[in-house]
Amino acid sequence: MKITYFGQSAFQIKTGKTTILIDPFLTGNKHTKVDPFDLNPEYILLTHAHQDHTGDSFDIARRTGATIITQTDYAQYINDILPEAKGCHAEGINFGGTFSADDFSVKLYPAWHTDARMVGNALVPVGVAAGMALTIEDKLIYDTGDTALFSDLKLVARKHPVDLALICIGGHFTMDADDALVAADFLQAKHVIPTHYNTFPSIQADPQKFVEQLPTGVGIIPDFDKEFDF
């Protein structure tokens, strides 16, 4: 598969048949120069509703017809309530549930994080934040989404050997780099990419320092917008 990291928590994954976007916050993301109109996914995975994760999802989904996969309550808001999501289609799954496509599947896990967005003039809870386990080409990628450190991350590794973990390190709104090191140990991932850092003043972190504290060869810091093979 081919993976591109756009900064914050935004990724593109290309399988043999399918293009997947994860949390495509692109407009307003200082790390990327990618134009959302140049991306043509079949699926968009959303860990939660916050704007720095939902990002450009609705515009991309309307233009391409991509299916949005997210937690079931947020999916219902997208399909039935949110005016900015008009013309989009979301498939909802809940914790423990799996969505399967031709050449990948995604299973939903809990994350310790809040989840709300503006609906009209009100800030409304729209489901709950999640982590996601993607199985692609017999490899498992675990995306923590936004989360605090919590011990149930150990259960992911108990059920699935994790080939690649995407772990938030920025602090303030999520766990910081020190807690992320513990999360990486809980997940026992063969490789780790740090995420959710240095996009805003409140989430400053040093990804190189984080990677240097992982076991040798585990940490990966991709260049923003540059595709790599995994």
Swiss-Prot record:
Alphabetical UniProt keywords: Hydrolase
GO MF annotations, alphabetized: hydrolase activity
Superkingdom of the source species: Bacteria
Record keyword Hydrolase present: yes
Gene3D superfamilies for the chain: Ribonuclease Z/Hydroxyacylglutathione hydrolase-like
Family matches, as InterPro entries: Metallo-B-lactamas, RibonucZ/Hydroxyglut_hydro, UPF0173, UPF0173_UPF0282_UlaG_hydrolase
Species per Swiss-Prot/TrEMBL record: Oenococcus oeni (strain ATCC BAA-331 / PSU-1)
NCBIfam families, per database record: PRK00685.1
Ribosomal protein in keyword set: no
PANTHER family (UniProt xref): UPF0173 METAL-DEPENDENT HYDROLASE MJ1163, UPF0173 METAL-DEPENDENT HYDROLASE MJ1163-RELATED
Protein name (database record): UPF0173 metal-dependent hydrolase OEOE_1287
Similarity remark: Belongs to the UPF0173 family.
